[in-house]
């Protein structure tokens, strides 16, 4: 099979990369009605599989789970989760032939085997759903022409999808119809009903394409979302300890620092995150972030180039075929790093202390978010998509590090994200070591003293922060989510 994106001509590639439309609330007036009375069969019962299924059932849809025969007979975790939540469970052969919509929510690595198993069992005119388009775009999976292929991609982990639904809200979501598989022209109606059933329509929906979702998703997770957090954690910890900081304190400052810093990012973007600093610290964080952007820009561009060309995917799929040798080696090496094995700090670190003593970490977040966004937009991805795949998801990933350090992050994210994370961090750590050697007192681990600042310089820095394109689009999208949340709570 050929990489689907590489079979398109340049005009088609640009059109699909640039497909992004923020959908109005009135477009979801019918809710999930298009799928009511139809049979929806979910394949896979992991975090997305279970939590999307719970939401869809609560929205009035007929949901069941198709699992491999051995998963049922051996009562594996997927079988236990589905049955404990009261769902009907059966084998592929028992459930797929009656399904109107088959939703494939297994890991990327399993998609080809799953799709090749279920396709022959699907009835004529049925629909196949994904929450990530890797199998279609990068693997180039060929789907029967009578089958409609759609995507609903929540921009949050599965647990968050469920929690927001229970609060009467939802999570921002991308939806798409594969242009090669929409024989009856009903793909968008199916996708809209599916996303409404998950609650995503209450938080904002982007009509996108399989191509735009995959290329932007890969770029975000490899660079700012996972790779930058891993590289930053290792670099900052080693720097602190080398300068005499207690390893336990250094570990806590970093482990919980990312979450604290990005909580401000979630509420008010880069502007609010930078506003948490004193004026001298803000000026220093800005200067550091500009240096970091200059150093890292070629690395971010290389990752985007390799994602667009398919070089990244072909390399990762070769590792799949080699029993994940590279992935497992990198995972083991990460687990042995000084940061991962450092003792826990029993004392308390106040919220503001994370900002005051983490100026470099704030600079890394700012540089990484802006670079990921800029690199995606320069490659033809629309700003709204680039925002969701950079700034929006960062607090969610930072939260996983706060739970169990890098181990937890790499367990929670997909194998695809983990592989890309290692590629980036293994290149980024040596790249930034000369920069780390030139840091000044107050950049990390101690606060920058209060002092006089140049008013004109502070004005210009504030203007530069606020006028960046990601701040403009972010303010619009966060405002929409806030407005929608008020409506959901009120109604």
From Swiss-Prot:
Residues that coordinate or bind Mg(2+) 2: 217, 389, 393
GO MF annotations in UniProt: ketol-acid reductoisomerase activity; magnesium ion binding
Protein family (similarity comment): Belongs to the ketol-acid reductoisomerase family.
HAMAP family: IlvC
Disulfide bonds: none
Keyword Cell cycle carried by entry: no
Protein residues bound to NADP(+): 45-48, 68, 76, 78, 108-110, 158
UniProt: Mg(2+) 1 binding residues: 217, 221
Lineage, broadest ranks: Bacteria, Pseudomonadati, Pseudomonadota, Gammaproteobacteria, Enterobacterales
UniProt keyword Nucleus present: no
Entry-linked SUPFAM superfamilies: 6-phosphogluconate dehydrogenase C-terminal domain-like (SSF48179), NAD(P)-binding Rossmann-fold domains (SSF51735)
InterPro entries: 6-PGluconate_DH-like_C_sf, 6PGD_dom2, KARI, KARI_C, KARI_N, NAD(P)-bd_dom_sf
Named cofactor requirement(s): Mg(2+)
General function of this protein: Involved in the biosynthesis of branched-chain amino acids (BCAA). Catalyzes an alkyl-migration followed by a ketol-acid reduction of (S)-2-acetolactate (S2AL) to yield (R)-2,3-dihydroxy-isovalerate. In the isomerase reaction, S2AL is rearranged via a Mg-dependent methyl migration to produce 3-hydroxy-3-methyl-2-ketobutyrate (HMKB). In the reductase reaction, this 2-ketoacid undergoes a metal-dependent reduction by NADPH to yield (R)-2,3-dihydroxy-isovalerate.
Keywords: Amino-acid biosynthesis, Branched-chain amino acid biosynthesis, Magnesium, Metal-binding, NADP, Oxidoreductase, Repeat
Domain KARI N-terminal Rossmann: 15-208
One cellular component (GO) term of this entry: cytosol
Domain KARI C-terminal knotted: 209-344, 345-484
Record field: catalytic activity: (2R)-2,3-dihydroxy-3-methylbutanoate + NADP(+) = (2S)-2-acetolactate + NADPH + H(+); (2R,3R)-2,3-dihydroxy-3-methylpentanoate + NADP(+) = (S)-2-ethyl-2-hydroxy-3-oxobutanoate + NADPH + H(+)
Cofactor note: Binds 2 magnesium ions per subunit.
Record's protein name: Ketol-acid reductoisomerase (NADP(+))
The species this protein was found in: Salmonella schwarzengrund (strain CVM19633)
GO biological process, one term: isoleucine biosynthetic process
Sequence positions that bind substrate: 414
